[in-house]
């Protein structure tokens, strides 16, 4: 399974989750886990996804999510799970 981690941070507004989830569904990216909080008007979300079925290259998805974030006024980052695994190896 090709897992990725998506983080979304910015000022809270209506439709952030809907727009991100619609993009993922349209690209055959399955959400495995999601956590979302709002702290003093600021939106923060972390998602873990399975990207096995998507036809797009990882770099394209990263770029498109960043552009989507700009459109809706948040910062969206997409990283491969391996990065986090490597950070915790000694």
Please place each PLM-identified region on the residue numbering.
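A conserved regulatory-domain signal marking ACT and ACT-like small-molecule sensing domains
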Residues: 1-90
